């Protein structure tokens, strides 16, 4: 039995097409990128195949920072000696907190159309193509093909 494994992480099973043309195994597909991890319906193809910098909002940290800023503003308003300095400090704190709320990361995943080819000609005569089977689980495509039962020995009679 021949077992072929291909890593296709991040690809949906329905977006994979497998064919054998002559003695060439062709695997084609489309890898999509979700614009927002919470919204899986918003998909986009990026044909650049380059790392990207993406922004991600974190609601829990921004709300806790806003609560801290409100507490700082209340403390500043209670202190009557340095109102001008405290207002400047609270404005600076608001600017700093809005900058720290933005999270950016680099994504090194490629997206878009892909094609993989495998030349089966060295073993093609050994393959029983009626038994070919493909499974896709956890980003791993496994193709299995049984060997033929035909022997390679052929006796030829002389006429």
Swiss-Prot record:
Residues 36-46, 61-95 have a biased composition (Low complexity). Keywords: Stress response. SUPFAM superfamilies: HSP20-like chaperones (SSF49764). InterPro entries: A-crystallin/Hsp20_dom, HSP20-like_chaperone, HspG1-11-like. The keyword Glycoprotein does not apply. Residues 35-101 are annotated as: Disordered. Gene3D superfamilies: 2.60.40.790. It holds the Pfam family HSP20. PANTHER family: HEAT SHOCK PROTEIN DDB_G0288861-RELATED. Belongs to the small heat shock protein (HSP20) family. This is Small heat shock protein hspM. It comes from Dictyostelium discoideum (Social amoeba).
